[in-house]
Amino acid sequence: KELGVKIAKVESKSDKDYAVNIKSLVDTKCDLIVSVGFLLDKTTVAAAKENPNVKFAIVDDQPQGAPGNLKPLIFNTAQSSFEAGYLAAALTKTGKVGTFGGMKIPTVTIFMDGFAQGVEYYNKQKGKDVKVLGWNAKSQDGQFVPQPDPFQNVAGGKSTAQTLLNQGADIILPVAGNAGNGALQAVKASGGKSNVIWVDADGCKTQAAYCDNIITSVYKGMDVAVFDAVKAVKDGKFNGDPYIGSLADKGTGLSDFHPFDS
């Protein structure tokens, strides 16, 4: 509204919809087409190459071989996840914290790496031995939601979280999209014995029913990144250089602590 632009939205139900949906936006004569996520990588690159006069941006991905009319909007969530790991290590009562992902892809494991590194740093600084369950940053092995459709598999997210809880973790960082709701269900059922650190957006706003179990959230400033891309198109200043959100520019960080702010 602030920029006075019209918005057209399409939602993909499966990967078969990716190319069709992007083509529909091209046919609508959109000046900028924004896709979201690693899974749309190849389709977005192909569309950008086929339509050099259309501007594209992709959130949460940095495609290889992208043309100059495609701008990656990415976030250094390793920085904020590091803070989340340090915080979790400081708050755990069991000496064990956990994390799991939706799929083993870079935009997921960057959170898990940062989280594990934050715990490791806490241990070094405080002389502690807090364990990270669900992810080994050195071997890049860990827990992921089972197929099919792991980012939507809430039941799979719940069972994966429950495994970590059963192993003694009392704080979990789920990096699994909608499947992360399963982790919220699992910790809520624990009766106050465990909690979650949410990702992507402020969980107390997006998952309000579970706010009492959300310590904080590792957010991405996706709204700011997309706004800036739209403004750049309108001002004639758009280019394909990656936007990289960091702690320094508040492109990522930890949200408010809400009930845990004490």
PLM features per residue range, with description:
Residues 1-262:
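A residue-level marker of the well-folded mature domains of exported/periplasmic proteins
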